[in-house]
Amino acid sequence: MVDTTQTTTEKKLTQSDIRGVFLRSNLFQGSWNFERMQALGFCFSMVPAIRRLYPENNEARKQAIRRHLEFFNTQPFVAAPILGVTLALEEQRANGAEIDDGAINGIKVGLMGPLAGVGDPIFWGTVRPVFAALGAGIAMSGSLLGPLLFFILFNLVRLATRYYGVAYGYSKGIDIVKDMGGGFLQKLTEGASILGLFVMGALVNKWTHVNIPLVVSRITDQTGKEHVTTVQTILDQLMPGLVPLLLTFACMWLLRKKVNPLWIIVGFFVIGIAGYACGLLGL
C-alpha cells in the first residue's frame, strides 16, 4: 500500500530574518513622505520576512508587499513592537490562518497611535534631553567626551528599543495589544512626561542666565565699603532663577498661541542685544 499523504512544511521565520527586519528598521524614516509617511519604511523593513514566508515571486508575495504600503505613522523607535506583531501575523497567514488584510492593517493602525503617545514623551521629551544635558555638562568643560557620550548613550537606547521591540512583538503576537492596553500606556506616558518636565525645569535654572544690573540703592557702611543693591539682587533674594522661569512660561504661552519658534528665538536675540545696549541687561 502506497502512502499518498502530503505533508505541508510549516513556514517559520528565523532569527536571521528578525535581525534583518531590525537592521532595516534603522532606515525607517529614509523614505518618509507626506502621502503615506512611514509606509515605505515599514514595507522595506518587512522585506526579509516576506522573502522567507513567500519564497516564490508570485501573487502572494506581491499582495504582501502591497499590504504594507498603506498609510503608517508613529514614533520611529516604538514602531519595533508593531513590526514584531506584524511578523507574527504574516507568519500565521502564510501557514494558512484566516487573517485578512484588514486584520493586519487594523492591528497596525490600532497600535501606532497609542505607541506614538508613549514614544514621543519618553524619547524626545525624556531620554534625549537627559543624555543631552549630561553630554553638554561635560562638553562645557572643554571635553570631547560630552558629545561622544550623548551619541553613544542615545544610540544604545535606540538600538536596544528597536531590537528587543521587534523580538518582543514577534514572540507575543497579537497578545501585545492586551499587554499594552488598559491604563498601562496612560501611566507610562504620565510618568515620562513628569520626569521630562522635571529635567527641563532643572535645565532652565542651570543654563539660562539673566542679569538685570539696574541699581536700586548704594549704601556706604562705617568702614567705607560701598554696598550696591541691584534689581537682580532683590530678585535672587525672592527666588533664584525667577526671570528665567518667567521667560520659560512666556515661551510656552507663545508656543501654545502657535507662534513660530524661530520668531521667538529672534525675539530673544533682539531683546538681549537691545537690553544690553540700554543698560537694562548685563552679562
Curated annotation (Swiss-Prot):
InterPro entries: GatZ_KbaZ_carbometab (IPR050303), PTS_IID_man (IPR004704). Pfam families: EIID-AGA. The keyword Cytoplasm does not apply. It is a multi-pass membrane protein. Residues 1-14, 53-59, 93-100, 174-183, 256-261 are cytoplasmic. The chain crosses the membrane at residues 101-140, 145-173, 184-209, 242-255, 262-280. One of its GO terms (biological process) is D-glucose import across plasma membrane. Residues 15-52, 60-92 dip into the membrane without crossing it. Induction: Expression of the manXYZ operon is positively regulated by the cAMP-CRP complex and negatively regulated by the Mlc transcriptional repressor. Expression is also weakly repressed by NagC. The EIID domain, with its homologous EIIC domain, forms the PTS system translocation channel and contains part of its specific substrate-binding site. This is PTS system mannose-specific EIID component. It comes from Escherichia coli (strain K12). The gene is manZ.
